C-alpha cells in the first residue's frame, strides 16, 4: 500500500465504522436528535479520532484535503436515495392513515361514553327536581287554601249583630256606654257616611256602627256587634227613687231622668238600653205582686172569721191591687210628697 492511500484511508475513514453505517445509526436515533445535531456530532467524532500523524499530513497537503472534505460534506448532507424513498413512503402512509382515521384523543371513547352516561343521569335528576318543585308548589297552594278557609271560618264566626232604628236628629245616641270613634266610611248609594265605634273598656270587644238611612234621613240605624263584658259606667251611679219610681213605671221615667242622671229632650236612649230597664222593672213588679197578692188572699180568706172588723176594712182599703209600685208605699207618704 502506498503512503497516499494509507493517508486517505486513515484520514477519511479513521475507524472501522463507515459514514453510511453512521448514517444508519443516525436514522435510528432520529427521534432524539435533529439533523444539525447529527452533523455536529459527526464532525466532532472525525476530529476526535484523527491521529497526530494524520493531522500533520493534513497540514502538509492542503490541496488533497479540500476535495475529499467537500465530498464528505456533500455525502453527509445528501442522504442516500433509498432512505429518502423510505421516509417519503412512511410519511405518505402516515398522512393517509391520519386522513382516513383521525387521531383519537386518549380515552376519547371512555369520555364520550361517560358524557352520555352523565347526560342520561342528569335527565332523571332534572325530572326529579321538577317533580319535587311541583310537589312543593302543590303543598304551598294547599296550605294557602287552608289558611284562606280558616280566615273565612273566622270571619263567619263573628258575633251576632243587632240593629236598632231610631228617629233622631243626633247620629250618636247615648246608650249608657262609652265609645271611641275609630273610622268612617262612605256608603254606596247614600249621601250619609257610616261611623265606626269601639267600646273604651280594654277587655270589651263590642263594636258599634252608626249610619243614617238614605231612604228616611230622620232615621238613625245603630248596629251593635258583640256583648259587653262589664257593667255600664252610668248604671254604677247611685239610683234616684224619684226618677225611677214614677206613676207610670220605668218606661215613663226615661224622659225625666233615669238612674240618677238627667236626660235632655233631644237625647234619646237606645232601644237596647230601654229593654234592659224594662226587663228589670218587670221582674221587680212580679216579685212585689206575688208578695202582696198572698197577703190579700189571706185577708179575703179570713174575712168571714173576723166579720166586719174595722181593722180588716182598713187593710182592704190600703192593699189595692193596681199592679204598680204605689201599692207598697203608704197613702200618707204619697200625700206628703
Swiss-Prot record:
Q: GO annotations under biological process?
A: protein localization involved in auxin polar transport; response to auxin; response to nematode
- Region described as Disordered: 100-160
Q: Which InterPro entries match?
A: TF_WRKY_IIc, WRKY_dom, WRKY_dom_sf, WRKY_plant
The highest taxon in the source lineage is: Eukaryota
Basic residues bias locations: 142-155
Enumerate composition-biased segments (Low complexity): 106-118
Cite the Gene3D superfamilies for this sequence. WRKY domain
Where is this chain's protein located in or outside the cell? Nucleus
Q: Which Gene Ontology terms of cellular component type are present?
A: nucleus
Q: What keywords is this UniProt entry annotated with?
A: DNA-binding, Nucleus, Transcription, Transcription regulation
Entry annotated with the keyword Cytoplasm: no
Q: Which residues mediate DNA binding here?
A: 168-233
**Which GO MF terms are attached to this record?**
DNA-binding transcription factor activity; transcription cis-regulatory region binding
Q: Which SMART domains match?
A: WRKY (SM00774)
Its family remark reads: Belongs to the WRKY group II-c family.
Described by its record, this protein's role is as follows: Transcription factor. Interacts specifically with the W box (5'-(T)TGAC[CT]-3'), a frequently occurring elicitor-responsive cis-acting element.
User: PANTHER family per the record?
Assistant: WRKY TRANSCRIPTION FACTOR 23, WRKY TRANSCRIPTION FACTOR PROTEIN 1-RELATED
Q: Protein name, please?
A: WRKY transcription factor 23
Q: What is the lineage of its organism?
A: Eukaryota, Viridiplantae, Streptophyta, Embryophyta, Tracheophyta
Amino acid at each position: 500500500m502506498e503512503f497516499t492511500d494509507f493517508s486517505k484511508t486513515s484520514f477519511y475513514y479513521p475507524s472501522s465504522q463507515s459514514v453510511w453505517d453512521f448514517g444508519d445509526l443516525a436514522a435510528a436515533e432520529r427521534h432524539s436528535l435533529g439533523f444539525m445535531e447529527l452533523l455536529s456530532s459527526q464532525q466532532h467524532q472525525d476530529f476526535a479520532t484523527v491521529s497526530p500523524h494524520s493531522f500533520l499530513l493534513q497540514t502538509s497537503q492542503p490541496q488533497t484535503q479540500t476535495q475529499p472534505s467537500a465530498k464528505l460534506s456533500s455525502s453527509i448532507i445528501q442522504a442516500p436515495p433509498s432512505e429518502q424513498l423510505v421516509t417519503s413512503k412512511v410519511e405518505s402512509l402516515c398522512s393517509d392513515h391520519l386522513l382516513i382515521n383521525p387521531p383519537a384523543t386518549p380515552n376519547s371513547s371512555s369520555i364520550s361514553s361517560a358524557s352520555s352516561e352523565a347526560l342520561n343521569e342528569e335527565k332523571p335528576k332534572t325530572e326529579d327536581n321538577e317533580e319535587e318543585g311541583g310537589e312543593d308548589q302543590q303543598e304551598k297552594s294547599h296550605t294557602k287554601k287552608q289558611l284562606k278557609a280558616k280566615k273565612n271560618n273566622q270571619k263567619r264566626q263573628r258575633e251576632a249583630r243587632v240593629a236598632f232604628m231610631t228617629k233622631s236628629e243626633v247620629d250618636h245616641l247615648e246608650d249608657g256606654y262609652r265609645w271611641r270613634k275609630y273610622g268612617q266610611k262612605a256608603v254606596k248609594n247614600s249621601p250619609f257616611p257610616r261611623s265606626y265605634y269601639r267600646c273604651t273598656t280594654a277587655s270589651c270587644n263590642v263594636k258599634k256602627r252608626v249610619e243614617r238611612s238614605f231612604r228616611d234621613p230622620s232615621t238613625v240605624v245603630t248596629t251593635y256587634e258583640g256583648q259587653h263584658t262589664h257593667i255600664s259606667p252610668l248604671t254604677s251611679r247611685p239610683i234616684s227613687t224619684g226618677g225611677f219610681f214614677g206613676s207610670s213605671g220605668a218606661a215613663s221615667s226615661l224622659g225625666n231622668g233615669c238612674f240618677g242622671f238627667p236626660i235632655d229632650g233631644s237625647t234619646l236612649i237606645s232601644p237596647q238600653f230601654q229593654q234592659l230597664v224594662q226587663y228589670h222593672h218587670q221582674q221587680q213588679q212580679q216579685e212585689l205582686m206575688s208578695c202582696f197578692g198572698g197577703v190579700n188572699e189571706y185577708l179575703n180568706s179570713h174575712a168571714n172569721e173576723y166579720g166586719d172588723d174595722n181593722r180588716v176594712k182598713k187593710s182592704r182599703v190600703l192593699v189595692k191591687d193596681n199592679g204598680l209600685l204605689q201599692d207598697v208605699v203608704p197613702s200618707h207618704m204619697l200625700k206628703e210628697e
